[in-house]
Design a protein with these regions (language model features):
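Conserved acidic functional residues
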Residues: 121, 175-176
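Conserved active-site-proximal phosphate/metal-binding subdomains
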Residues: 145-149, 153-172, 178-334
Length: 334
């Protein structure tokens, strides 16, 4: 039987926060979950002590449904196995696993077999069907999305096509959703909830660099481009970013343009790096990868994550009056 996202995850608002690497730390994920939606930690390449530290903060910050996102194609099967093992061993069952891109079936089976909810983001019909067959909540990404693109279809077209094939699956629309009106369009196309990424880049709890946040708020969809230039650390995947001097001239030398700190360790940032500028990044921020979707035109300024959740609460399926009250109560506590 078809369930809304709220029913599938045991949350009050049918909304997922994207587990954006570098940007979505424990503070953002917990704030979203405490507001009644489902927050998500950007696990990205974290493993070992660094991942354990982030998981401890995540679990300490909320006892509600909250996720950890990993990227199979970036880390490879062995590292992904280590990451999944840590989450299963070190967190309670309300922590769900989110995967960006369709992994091997064995990975899905391991997660669901452990009694954890699985969320898989896809960009093609084939992967959407595979994810649903594995019992996953299926995040349907359109090319309107910021960040790395998993397919070539527009959001609502892909949602509608998958809904026709998967009448009982829980489908979550992603890409270009910056307003309740846009969320309503996605629901009308057949979605059971929505995922927001760019909208949470500018959340007060986000770890995005202030320059990045300001640039998103000052932009509209014409300021974004789909490119493949930010390929160091994640090659072979097109991505939507804010246009920069680097996207306009990709023949510049691959020299270091900044530094950043991840879980206490300092790293240099080369030009064309896939890494986003965070609050710990210094250097030529304006040349770095600032992932941004077509929703930016509806985003006007930094605000608490709870305010973002509250804005969408009344329009999303499965939320209802109870969900709205919960969001307002949570906001009052922040």
């Amino acid at each position: 039987m078809r369930a809304t996202l709220a029913e599938a995850l045991g949350i009050r608002v049918s909304l997922l926060q994207s587990g954006m690497g570098g940007v979505a730390g424990p503070d953002l994920a917990c704030a979203v979950s405490e507001a009644g939606a489902a927050g998500c930690l950007g696990g990205y390449k974290l493993v070992g002590e660094a991942l354990s530290a982030a998981l401890k903060r995540l679990v300490a910050g909320t006892d509600r449904a909250v996720g950890v996102n990993f990227i199979p194609e970036v880390v490879g099967p062995e590292e992904l196995d280590r990451q999944v093992t840590q989450v299963l061993d070190e967190t309670p069952r309300q922590v769900y696993l989110s995967l960006f891109g369709m992994p091997d079936d064995a990975v899905c089976e391991r997660i669901t077999g452990a009694g954890r909810q699985l969320v898989v983001q896809i960009g093609t019909v084939r992967d959407g069907v595979r994810a649903a067959e594995q019992g996953a909540i299926v995040v349907v990404q359109g090319t309107e999305a910021g960040g790395h693109l998993l397919g070539t279809s527009h959001r609502d077209e892909l949602v509608a096509e998958l809904r026709a094939l998967l009448p009982d699956a829980c489908l979550v629309a992603a890409g270009g959703i910056g307003s309740p009106a846009e969320a309503a369009r996605a629901v009308a196309a057949g979605a059971d909830g929505v995922l927001l990424g760019t909208a949470f880049v500018v959340a007060r709890e986000s770890m995005a660099h202030p320059y990045f946040k300001t640039a998103v708020c000052a932009s509209d969809e014409a300021d974004t481009v789909i490119t493949d230039v930010y390929e160091i650390g994640w090659s072979g995947r097109r991505h939507r970013v804010l246009a920069t001097a680097v996207t306009r001239d990709c023949d510049q030398p691959k020299k270091f343009i900044g530094r950043t700190v991840v879980e206490g360790k300092q790293y240099v940032v080369p030009r064309f790096s896939a890494a986003v500028p965070t609050v710990t990044t210094s250097g030529r921020i304006e040349e770095m990868a600032m992932y941004c979707g077509l929703s930016c035109g509806a985003i006007s300024g930094e605000r608490p994550a709870a305010d973002i959740v509250a804005e969408f609460a009344r329009i999303l399926p499965g939320s209802g009056t109870v969900g709205t009250e919960n969001v307002e109560e949570s906001h009052g506590k922040l």
